[in-house]
Amino acid sequence: MYHILVVDDESRIRALIRKYAEFEGHTVTEAGDGMEAVNLCRTQTFDLIIMDIMMPKMDGVQATMRIRSEKNIPIIMLSAK
């Protein structure tokens, strides 16, 4: 199936998304902030990124801009607000 990167500073949210994605047969990698996501995208290949907007170190918007400057990966942005 697909390799999905889930990026959120809340481990419970990452676990919930992982549970549903793995149930559907997808492989999931997790990152706790935008900088970690950018670094993972440089070393791994993902089919989809599900990313929170508000995170420490680097927020989802900044991470999206950096990732998109290097790769063309679909990104779904999440927000609690």
Each language-model region and where it sits:
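Acidic catalytic/metal-coordinating carboxylates
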Residues: 33-36, 59-62
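Charged docking surfaces used in two-component/phosphorelay signaling
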Residues: 15-23
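Active-site residues of response regulator receiver
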Residues: 52, 79
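Short hydrophobic/Thr-rich beta-strand motif most characteristic of the beta2 strand and flanking loop
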Residues: 25-32, 40
